[in-house]
Design a protein with these regions (language model features):
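Conserved active-site and cofactor/substrate-binding residues in soluble primary-metabolism enzymes
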Residues: 16, 35, 39, 53-60, ...
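A glycine- and small/hydrophobic-rich beta-loop-beta segment
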Residues: 102-230, 238
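Internal helix-turn-beta structural module
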Residues: 200, 210-283
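General beta-strand structural signal in soluble alpha/beta enzymes
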Residues: 51-56, 73-75, 82-83, 112, ...
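Single conserved hydrophobic/aromatic residue that forms the stacking wall/gate
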Residues: 1-9, 14
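Short, basic, glycine/proline-bearing loop/turn elements
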Residues: 38-50, 154-159, 231-244
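A charged, amphipathic alpha-helical module
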Residues: 19-80
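Short acidic, glycine/serine/threonine-rich loops at helix termini
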Residues: 83-87, 93-94, 127-132, 197-201, ...
Length: 283
């Protein structure tokens, strides 16, 4: 994260001065052995064949694609609340996570972005510390959602560490899609809630005795308590259904209530991990 803005990074090309700069840092900052330019060159040549097909003048490549009318898809890794400016600072990442920054990273003019799709699960989850208003604090209840959640449960893919889980948060989600400038929302993992007889949705925050429906700054967020609305669960297996209208009424009520609270159209939902499990709500 630091190398490029510090102006000490290396581009995908050979520069005679690259070792000179790096060696100054190694010698006077880290007191480490210096790099040998010839050895480094040989090592880079080993990697060249693997990465060469993916290196090009991306500006020209993208501009030509736009002129030819091709569709370009940009995918962000993290959500709004991990953004260093608009997220729950300091529990954020080090680079922007908003859709607008996709233009910067890819070199696409901002006026060329026509559709911004925000993806949210049908419940909430989090990794690591930080404010989590709708978190399920009862460990037994949380563990049940972890087991049923995700593709292989809500556990770290590498460490196996249990993730924090909670009910869907309309306040945080509305804030998130507003910051992203969403044109549509996709709700995934509806099937993960099928075991529940009742499902809660966080519809507001209680802050110092007052109920609010906006997402506050981090110091205030620390004092917020969730305000829940309880829904009757569908309590049946909904996997395999491919038509939105054939989902249980309780499932549709859940989706459409959330849609009304966040103020953005939910155009697709999913009821399983497969590609085929994407259901178009709005055709």
């Amino acid at each position: 994260y630091e190398i490029m803005p510090s102006l000490v990074g290396s581009e995908m090309c050979i520069r005679d001065s690259i070792c000179t700069l790096k060696n100054l840092i190694l010698k006077y900052v880290y007191n480490k052995p210096l790099l040998d330019a010839d050895e480094l060159f040989e090592k880079c040549m080993e990697y060249k064949e693997k990465i060469a097909p993916f290196v090009c003048d991306t500006h020209t490549y993208i501009q030509n694609a736009l002129k030819e009318g091709k569709e370009i898809l940009l995918e962000g890794q993290l959500g709004t609340l991990k953004d260093p400016d608009f997220g729950i600072y300091p529990m954020v990442t080090s680079s922007p996570t908003l859709a607008g920054y996709g233009c910067v990273g890819a070199g696409i003019p901002a006026n060329q972005i026509k559709d911004i799709v925000c993806v949210t699960k049908a419940y909430s989850s989090a990794v690591g510390a930080g404010e989590f208003v709708s978190e399920i604090l009862d460990e037994e209840e949380a563990q049940q959602l972890r087991i049923h959640g995700g593709d292989k449960g809500e556990f770290g893919a590498t460490t196996g560490r249990p993730r924090r889980v909670g009910w869907f948060d309309c306040v945080a989600t509305r804030y998130g899609v507003e910051c992203q400038g969403a044109t549509q929302v996709v709700m995934t993992a509806l099937d993960c809630l099928s075991y529940l007889e009742e499902i809660k949705v966080c519809v507001g925050y209680e802050l110092d005795g007052e109920v609010i429906d906006y997402f506050p700054t981090t110091p205030k967020l620390k004092r917020c308590k969730p305000v829940f609305k309880t829904f009757k669960g569908w309590h049946c297996d909904i996997r395999g259904i491919r038509d939105y209208d054939k989902l249980p009424q309780e499932t549709r009520d859940y989706v459409e209530f959330i849609e009304s609270k966040i103020g953005f159209p939910i155009t697709m939902v999913s009821n399983g991990p497969e590609r085929e499990a994407i259901i178009h709500k709005i055709k």
